[in-house]
Swiss-Prot record:
Keyword presence, Membrane: no
Residues with N6-carboxylysine modification: K192
Protein name: Ribulose bisphosphate carboxylase large chain
Catalytic activity, EC: 4.1.1.39
Top-level taxon of the source organism: Eukaryota
EC class name: lyase
Keyword NADP: no
Subunit structure of this chain's protein: Heterohexadecamer of 8 large chains and 8 small chains; disulfide-linked. The disulfide link is formed within the large subunit homodimers.
């Protein structure tokens, strides 16, 4: 009899479909699955597909009212992870209709929702996502993108330079503005609010916005270059966030900033739409990312968070520095840097890219290298990140023995020297130290910076292997 058979049944009967060929419109996910002892990988992979799409733990009579074949996620391929015991990469295909158009929030609620607490799994990590063109086209994406940003700022042929204002908490608005002015006047393109600067008792947001705007207009007038300061619009409510962005627009500044993970994808997407409609660039900080992406066997890899940001919208995003890290990390970081900047990225497992991704007409995002970098790293950073990047030196500017402005001068001189050397055909990987030393001869500021940070190891020799 054709009937409804109650009871608990294996997920793999319905959700493990090795014969399935993914469609162009499917969203594909690569999960690193660590099953509990005794759970076969097919069952674990099928459980992931089920729990992140249409499944529940038992058979329900309402299953008969819909077409599971049309809406279910399918685990279509499983491979063991080399060198790891009891870990598998499970590939899952999700039909297009499972996700609301233009909503990163809804996509994540399904794909990385309840399934991560699932008992049959010891650990679960989302390694990569292939976003189908049909779904990509439902997103606005970055407010402006790389080319429009260069045109707005009138800066071409080199990476952009930034600096996070320190101490990050405790300065008054007036003193904060002074620090901004000194950095911009010395030759930086941007200064940055720290991610934890919102609107605290010692410095309310409106005062900070005013003094920073004054600083950048003064620096612009004196240098003849367009300057920006990332005004952090992150707030406790979406309404307050937009209010801050509106005030920034009224001041006529070029760029605002948002903490996209702590602020949330819904707020971020709203802000990105506002920024495109009102000609503001949007700088994105990734505070909280390590909570999600640090563990190798559980969580979400940063390349997925980076893809999600490109869909939600942002013109800059922090993406690590690569310098002084291991070679493998270098390849993987460059993998998601390409995912941020390029229109079309080929599958390349050696760089951690599990799927070919076509972004069609979504603008690119500038990767921001920030954290523990200084003038000796400049050749490495120029070589690794190329022109389409923002290099941010916080302590590497403000820690200069003579102050902020000379610190900014040192960084700008180092950058211009590296770009010129590269354009003349010199090998930055081999001659990096030499190029910086030569530039020191005609820049006292750079010489002083090099002296301060010379003890900090410059680990770039290994780059020849790339």
């Amino acid at each position: 009899s054709v009937g409804f058979k109650a009871g608990v049944k294996d997920y793999k009967l319905n959700y493990y479909t090795p014969e399935y060929t993914p469609k162009d419109t499917d969203t594909l996910a690569a999960f690193r699955v660590t099953p509990q002892p005794g759970v076969p990988p097919e069952e674990a992979g099928a459980a992931v597909a089920a729990e992140s799409s249409t499944g529940t733990w038992t058979t329900v009579w309402t299953d008969g009212l819909t077409s599971l074949d049309r809406y279910k996620g399918r685990c279509y391929h499983i491979e063991p992870v080399a060198g790891e015991e009891n870990q598998y990469i499970c590939y899952v295909a999700y039909p297009l209709d499972l996700f609301e158009e233009g909503s990163v929030t809804n996509m994540f609620t399904s794909i990385v929702g309840n399934v991560f607490g699932f008992k049959a799994l010891r650990a679960l990590r989302l390694e990569d996502l292939r976003i189908p063109v049909a779904y990509v086209k439902t997103f606005q994406g970055p407010p402006h993108g790389i080319q429009v940003e260069r045109d707005k700022l009138n800066k071409y042929g080199r990476p952009l330079l930034g600096c996070t204002i320190k101490p990050k908490l405790g300065l008054s608005a007036k003193n904060y503005g002074r620090a901004v002015y000194e950095c911009l006047r010395g030759g930086l393109d941007f200064t940055k609010d720290d991610e934890n600067v919102n609107s605290q008792p010692f410095m309310r947001w409106r005062d900070r916005f005013l003094f920073c705007a004054e600083a950048l207009y003064k620096a612009q007038a004196e240098t003849g270059e367009i300057k920006g300061h990332y005004l952090n619009a992150t707030a406790g409510t979406c309404e307050e966030m937009i209010k801050r962005a509106v005030f920034a627009r009224e001041l006529g500044v070029p760029i605002v900033m948002h903490d996209y993970l702590t602020g949330g994808f819904t707020a971020n997407t709203s802000l990105a739409h506002y920024c495109r409609d009102n000609g503001l660039l949007l700088h994105i900080h990734r505070a909280m990312h390590a909570v999600i992406d640090r563990q190798k066997n559980h969580g979400i890899h940063f390349r997925v968070l980076a893809k999600a940001l490109r869909m939600s919208g942002g013109d800059h995003i922090h993406s690590g520095t690569v310098v002084g890290k291991l070679e493998g990390e270098r390849e993987i970081t460059l993998g998601f840097v390409d995912l941020l900047r390029d229109d079309f990225i080929e599958k390349d497992r050696s760089r951690g890219i599990y799927f070919t991704q076509d972004w069609v007409s979504l603008p690119g995002v500038l990767p921001v290298a920030s954290g523990g970098i200084h003038v000796w790293h400049m050749p490495a950073l120029t070589e690794i990140f190329g022109d389409d990047s923002v290099l941010q030196f916080g302590g590497g500017t403000l820690g200069h023995p003579w102050g902020n402005r000379p610190g900014a001068v040192a960084n700008r001189v180092a950058l211009e020297a590296c770009v010129q050397a590269r354009n003349e055909g010199r090998d930055l990987a081999r001659e990096g130290n030499e190029i910086i030393r030569e530039a020191c001869k005609w820049s006292l500021e750079l010489a002083a910076a090099c002296e301060v940070w010379k003890e900090i190891k410059f680990e770039f020799e290994a780059m020849d292997t790339l």
